[in-house]
Amino acid sequence: EHIHGAPCGVFWHSALNGDGTPNGYAVYDVEGAAITDWRYKSSLHDESFQIRLHRGGDTHSGFTYPYTPKTVIANVWNADPEWRVTLCENGVETKAMTLVTTYTDAWSVGYHVGVLGRGDNYKSPCKHMYVAEPNDVRAALKVVAVDRWGNRYEQSEFTAPDDFTDARSPVY
């Protein structure tokens, strides 16, 4: 079972859903009666954009993640139990990241509640958040996610605290 993010985000108030997933839709490839691939397509990004990175100590309009500043947090919105999500340091895969499903996306909540002033009903549990602490915090960090079909997605850019440029609803 998969529940995908909505193309309207949080009731058209932003370009992202309450769990941090960007507005978008699912794309399924089907051959006969079999699904041969599926992926999430953000409305404002290309299909390679599957991961958003945060640092554990960052504050987003008053909301933080419950981790130390050296923790790498990866929101991998289309992930399911068959995905493999790993942390790389200086180009070398160093460890598998741990799935945590008990927290909300502090960046999304920071925008919806902290910036827009929406109520607590704009908080959604995030069931696709991964965490890991690097061995060397000075290393060049990258998260690599490989889905059940073998598609590989990478992200090395961290979202800066209170940078909500990507969250704002586009003007059509």
Summary of predicted features, one role per range:
Residues 1-57, 93-95, 111-113:
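Conserved beta-sheet core of the metallophosphoesterase superfamily
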Residues 53-172:
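Long, low-complexity serine/threonine/glycine- and acidic-rich segments characteristic of extracellular
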